[in-house]
C-alpha cells in the first residue's frame, strides 16, 4: 500500500513537494489544504480548506506542512499534529528547541509522530555537521550559504515602504572558503563570512537613500553583515533574477594527530531552493512513516531517522549497491 501524503499550504515549497511525490513509486498525493479558496494544483490533485483537515484523519499517513517559519509553522505544526503524523521545514534556528518542545507535547498526547526542521539547512547540512564533528573531534566547523536567493530576506525588503519588488542574494566570501580548504581555521562567523547583495525595484517617487538605510539597519536580517543595495528596474529584475537558486557548503577542518590535517566538505548547488527542500521533505516523510509504523510517537528531527528508512530500496539492495 502506498504512503498517503497530504500537503498543507500551496506556495513554492508545496509545489516542490507535489512534484517530488509524483516521482516516488511508493507514494500518492491525497490532497492539498490551503487557506485560499479555489486554487488549482499543478498535478490536478483535489484542494480543501484548512477546516477540512480533521476530516481526513485515517486517510492520510503523513502531512507535509509547507508554511513559513515566522508565523505559520509555529501554530500549524502543533495543530495538525493532533490528527496526523507531520513533517515541516521550520528553519528559525534559534527557535528550534521551543518549537520541538511544543510539538513533542502535542504529539505524545495524540500518539502521533512529527519530524521538524527538515530540508537542507536545517536538514542535510545538520547531518553533515554532526558526521564531521564526530569523525574529527579536534577541529572547527563552518557553514556557508549561497550564492542564492534568500526568500525570507527578499520578503523583508519588499515590506519596506516604497519598495515594489526585491531579491536578496546571500553570497559566501571566497577568501574564507579557500583558506578552510587549504587546512586553515580562520576566525569567521556567519556575519563576517557572507555578503548580502540586494536588488531593489523602488517606486518612482520613493526615497532610495531612506530605503537603503532601512535595509542596512534591519535587525535580524542585515545588521552585522556587509550589505550592498542595487536599485534596478522591474524589467531587469524579471529578466535577470526570476529563479530561486541556492546552495552552500559545510566544512570541517581538523587534525587526527598533531600536524595531520583533514578537511571535510559537503556542498549543494540548487537550481530551485523550494524544489530541493520539497524533495528532502518527501524523502523524510517516508522515514517518518516507517518510524511511526515502528511505534514512534513525539517530535523528531533528521538525527533520529536511520538513513535506510528514507530510501525506496530494501536493506539487501542498499548493502549490495550503495555500501
Please annotate each region the language model reported.
Residues 4, 15-16, 23-53, 149-285:
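C-terminal substrate-binding/catalytic lobe of Rossmann-fold NAD(P)-dependent oxidoreductases
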Residues 10-11:
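Glycine-rich Rossmann-fold phosphate-binding loop(s) that bind the pyrophosphate
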Residues 53-62, 70-89:
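Rossmann-fold NAD(P) dinucleotide-binding segment
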Residues 88-89, 114-118, 144, 167-168:
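General beta-strand structural signal in soluble alpha/beta enzymes
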Residues 90-114:
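Rossmann-fold NAD(P)-binding glycine/threonine-rich loop
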Residues 124-140, 155-165, 287:
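Oxidoreductase and adenylate-handling cofactor-binding alpha/beta cores
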Residues 258, 262-323:
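NAD(P)-dependent Rossmann-like dehydrogenase/reductase catalytic/cofactor-binding core
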